[in-house]
């Protein structure tokens, strides 16, 4: 992958200071160079920021006092704050996180062998997928780098402080929260770079996953920027159904989307040659055995594993959750074709933290112009 510098939209705070959470390592080194310091100082500060979740320059004991004073004058480390916490009976935690005067939601999902953090990339979403609660709230804006990586930072700080209670440290990050990550590449990519950086959170590229509904030009662009695990929100075995439930399919149909996925796989080491297919199970919409046969035929040339996701309801939604028996029959058809097929266990649905339930603030649904502009950015690659 090419080492392409991605410039954040805006890295200064209201008081004119640089928020260091907005900078990846290359940018951090440039920042310290401008201060007249050696590049290794950037590495030292990043280690304090991400290995120890430190946001106080005075606590960085291997930084000399003069430099600490200089940093306090021109920079800060400001992660978004948690304004509400909900805990599920299954151990899942959902945090409402303040980003300016709005909120996004971040979900911590502990399991026996890992702990996954589901991170948001936008306030709301422009894509209007019919089965997703986030999409029904409309689109407001992109999150900055500091607001994306800040979700990981804040969660890591909370979990780190709670080690005595047995909470597992974050081992995986999935860009599957609110928003379409590929419509915010300029901020999502630097945030993921920090997740992967040894002086950042040091995660393996196989443990950072980006999920997309199919913004094809941006997916091609992503392949030249960074290598992470890829999950695609397919949800339908044919264009007729997908046009209805995932409207971006009218711009980039399934064939076009899967071709872009295969191009990404050719460049990627993180995916080990196959992609994760996400398929939400909607009762008598896309969950029949005939749909399973169609899906198997559709994916025969795309190396993949398939996650079947029981749909999680929200008020006013026109769908129902597929029965366990229908999901089981669907899964067995796919496995008969040789596909690795997993029925995802629903986590956090009692606190509306499950897949498709994140909403954050309710946003004025009349903001159609903003949503159409964002959909236009999916077409104009210069705007993505």
From Swiss-Prot:
Does the entry feature the keyword ATP-binding, yes or no?
no
Name the InterPro entries on file.
Aldolase_TIM (IPR013785), Methyltransferase_A (IPR040072), RlmN_N (IPR048641), RNA_MTrfase_RlmN (IPR027492), rRNA_lsu_MTrfase_RlmN/Cfr (IPR004383), rSAM (IPR007197)
Which cofactor(s) are needed, names only? [4Fe-4S] cluster
Enzyme Commission number(s) from the entry: 2.1.1.192
One Gene Ontology term from the biological process aspect of the record: response to antibiotic
Task: Tell me the residue numbers annotated for binding S-adenosyl-L-methionine.
Answer: 179-180, 211, 233-235, 312
Q: What region holds the Radical SAM core domain?
A: 111-350
Q: What is its main location?
A: cytoplasm
**Where, by residue number, is the active site?**
105 (proton acceptor), 355 (s-methylcysteine intermediate)
What Gene Ontology molecular function terms does this protein carry? 4 iron, 4 sulfur cluster binding; metal ion binding; rRNA (adenine(2503)-C2-)-methyltransferase activity; rRNA binding; tRNA (adenine(37)-C2)-methyltransferase activity; tRNA binding
Record localization? Cytoplasm
Q: Please list the residues that bind [4Fe-4S] cluster.
A: 125, 129, 132
Key word Membrane present in the record?
Answer: no
- Phenotype on deletion? Cells lacking this gene lack nucleoside m2A in both rRNA and tRNAs. Inactivation of rlmN produces an error-prone phenotype since it increases the misreading of a UAG stop codon, and thus decreases translational accuracy. Also leads to increased susceptibility to tiamulin, hygromycin A and sparsomycin.
Keywords of the record, alphabetical order, are: 4Fe-4S, Antibiotic resistance, Cytoplasm, Disulfide bond, Iron, Iron-sulfur, Metal-binding, Methyltransferase, rRNA processing, S-adenosyl-L-methionine, Transferase, tRNA processing
Q: Name a single GO cellular component.
A: cytosol
Catalyses: adenosine(2503) in 23S rRNA + 2 reduced [2Fe-2S]-[ferredoxin] + 2 S-adenosyl-L-methionine = 2-methyladenosine(2503) in 23S rRNA + 5'-deoxyadenosine + L-methionine + 2 oxidized [2Fe-2S]-[ferredoxin] + S-adenosyl-L-homocysteine; adenosine(37) in tRNA + 2 reduced [2Fe-2S]-[ferredoxin] + 2 S-adenosyl-L-methionine = 2-methyladenosine(37) in tRNA + 5'-deoxyadenosine + L-methionine + 2 oxidized [2Fe-2S]-[ferredoxin] + S-adenosyl-L-homocysteine
What's the domain of life for this entry? Answer: Bacteria
Q: Which family does it belong to?
A: Belongs to the radical SAM superfamily. RlmN family.
Q: What is this protein called?
A: Dual-specificity RNA methyltransferase RlmN
Q: Which organism is it from?
A: Escherichia coli (strain K12)
- Organism ancestry: Bacteria, Pseudomonadati, Pseudomonadota, Gammaproteobacteria, Enterobacterales
């Amino acid at each position: 992958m090419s080492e392409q510098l991605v410039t954040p939209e805006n890295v200064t705070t209201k008081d004119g200071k640089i928020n260091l959470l907005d900078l990846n390592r290359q940018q951090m080194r440039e920042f310290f160079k401008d201060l007249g310091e050696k590049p290794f100082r950037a590495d030292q500060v990043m280690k304090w920021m991400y290995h120890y979740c430190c946001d106080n320059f005075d606590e960085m004991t291997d930084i000399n006092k003069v430099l600490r004073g200089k940093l306090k004058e021109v920079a800060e480390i400001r992660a978004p704050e948690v304004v509400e916490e909900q805990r599920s009976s299954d151990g899942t935690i959902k945090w409402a996180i303040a980003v300016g005067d709005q909120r996004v939601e971040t979900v911590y999902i502990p399991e026996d062998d890992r702990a996954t953090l589901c991170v948001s990339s936008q306030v709301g979403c422009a894509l209007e997928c019919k089965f997703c609660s986030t999409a029904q709230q409309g689109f407001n804006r992109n999150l900055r780098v500091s607001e994306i990586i800040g979700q990981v930072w804040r969660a890591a700080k909370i979990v780190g402080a709670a080690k005595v209670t047995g909470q597992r440290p974050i081992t995986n990050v999935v860009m599957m929260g609110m928003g379409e990550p590929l419509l915010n590449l300029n901020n999502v990519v630097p945030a993921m770079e920090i997740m992967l950086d040894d002086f950042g959170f040091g995660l393996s590229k196989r443990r950072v996953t980006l999920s997309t509904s199919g913004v094809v030009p941006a997916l091609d662009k992503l392949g030249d920027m960074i290598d992470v695990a890829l999950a695609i929100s397919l949800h339908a075995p044919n264009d007729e159904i997908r046009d209805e439930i995932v409207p971006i399919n009218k711009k980039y149909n399934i064939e076009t989307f899967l071709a872009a996925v295969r191009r990404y796989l050719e460049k990627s080491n993180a995916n080990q040659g196959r992609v994760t297919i996400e398929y939400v199970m909607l009762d008598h919409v896309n969950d029949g055995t005939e749909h399973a046969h169609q899906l198997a035929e559709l994916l025969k040339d795309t190396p993949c594993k398939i996650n079947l996701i029981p749909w999680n309801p929200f008020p006013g939604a026109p769908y129902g959750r597929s029965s366990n028996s229908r999901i089981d029959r669907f899964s067995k058809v796919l496995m008969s074709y040789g596909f690795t097929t997993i029925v995802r266990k629903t986590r956090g649905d009692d606190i509306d933290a499950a897949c498709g339930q994140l909403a954050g603030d309710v946003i004025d649904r009349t903001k159609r112009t903003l949503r159409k502009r964002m959909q236009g950015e999916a077409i104009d690659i210069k705007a993505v």
